[in-house]
Design a protein with these regions (language model features):
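Cytoplasmic-entry segments and transmembrane alpha-helices of multi-pass inner-membrane transporters
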Residues: 1, 58-97, 153
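Transmembrane alpha-helices
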Residues: 2-8, 80, 84, 131, ...
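A structural signal for multi-pass alpha-helical bundles of membrane permease subunits
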Residues: 13-18, 90-103, 128-131, 140, ...
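Periplasmic/extracellular loop-to-transmembrane helix junction in inner-membrane transport proteins
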Residues: 13-54, 66-67, 71, 114-115, ...
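Interhelical loop and adjacent transmembrane-helix boundary motif
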Residues: 18-32, 191, 197-240, 247-248
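Membrane-interfacial helix termini and adjacent extracytoplasmic/periplasmic loops
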Residues: 24, 31-35, 70, 90-130, ...
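C-terminal transmembrane helix and the adjacent membrane-cytosol boundary/short C-terminal tail
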Residues: 59-70, 142-153, 157, 164-168, ...
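Membrane-cytosol interface at the C-terminal ends of specific transmembrane alpha-helices
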Residues: 115-157, 183
């Protein structure tokens, strides 16, 4: 009963209110106006989630190969980004990127009037995403690697399976479910990430989260309901998949 009340107050009633706003203020151009932000959210979410997963996988493998105290400390430092507010992280990344841009402008043959090479590109946004959500992917992948017995790795090394071949033929098949979970979790977080996206995005490059922020800042809560529902549906995807997987197992 208590859990039902919490679910009702925290999820069901807000979703019903969003649906009421969408129906009451529906306009013909609402969906078409959201197509580009929705596409941007999907693209940056998928690309960012895959990049975060790849970096996390390499870090976990490196940690398993080097069990020294230095490697452990370095691993923990690289996963601190999740504890840092997105706006603070965006500013922290923007400062060295701006300095690097100034150096590049001095040495690269750029046209007059060019004020940035890296700033305002998706590269900066993706770099910030990797730092921010690396811990989320690492925790999921580390859980999967606990099922990889050291004897399997030793046998592969004896058979001269090393480097990229070891990752492709041993690690990935054994932890592919954990890799999928990592991608899904990061994807959902990227879909609703706003501060980093707002501060590092290219000009006029909106996502659903940025569009919601713009509507709410102007007090247009009804217009923000439709993109909010889309993000909620995206967040329900991993919940449904995890529940199906748990029922199967």
């Amino acid at each position: 009963m208590y859990c039902g009340v919490i679910l009702l107050v925290s999820f069901v009633l807000p979703v019903i209110q969003l649906i009421v706003w969408v129906v009451a203020h529906w306009q013909q151009g609402d969906v078409s106006a959201l197509l580009q932000p929705m596409g941007n959210s999907l693209v940056i979410g998928l690309v960012g989630a895959v990049l975060v997963m790849v970096v996390a996988l390499l870090l976990v493998i490196a940690k398993r190969s080097d069990k020294s105290l230095f490697a452990t400390i370095l691993m923990r430092i690289t996963t601190l980004g999740y504890a840092i507010p997105g706006s603070v992280l965006a500013i922290g990344i923007f400062i060295p990127i701006a300095a690097m841009d100034n150096l590049l402008l001095q040495f690269l043959p750029v046209s007059d009037g060019t004020t940035a090479v890296i700033k305002g590109t998706l590269i900066v946004m993706l770099l910030a995403y990797i730092i921010r959500f690396l811990a989320l992917a690492v925790s999921s992948i580390e859980a999967g690697f606990e099922r990889v017995r050291p004897s399997l790795v030793e046998s592969a090394v004896i058979l001269n399976v090393r480097g990229v071949a070891l990752i492709r033929r041993l690690y990935i098949p054994l932890v592919k479910s954990s890799l999928g979970v990592a991608v899904l979790m990061v994807f959902v977080d990227l879909m609703k990430e706003m501060p980093i996206t707002l501060m590092t995005r290219p000009s006029d490059w909106d996502t659903l989260a940025v569009r919601i922020y713009a509507f709410t800042m102007e007090g247009q809560f009804q217009q923000a309901a439709l993109p909010a529902l889309v993000i909620i549906l995206a967040g329900l995807l991993p919940v449904i998949l995890f529940s199906k997987e748990s029922n199967v197992t």
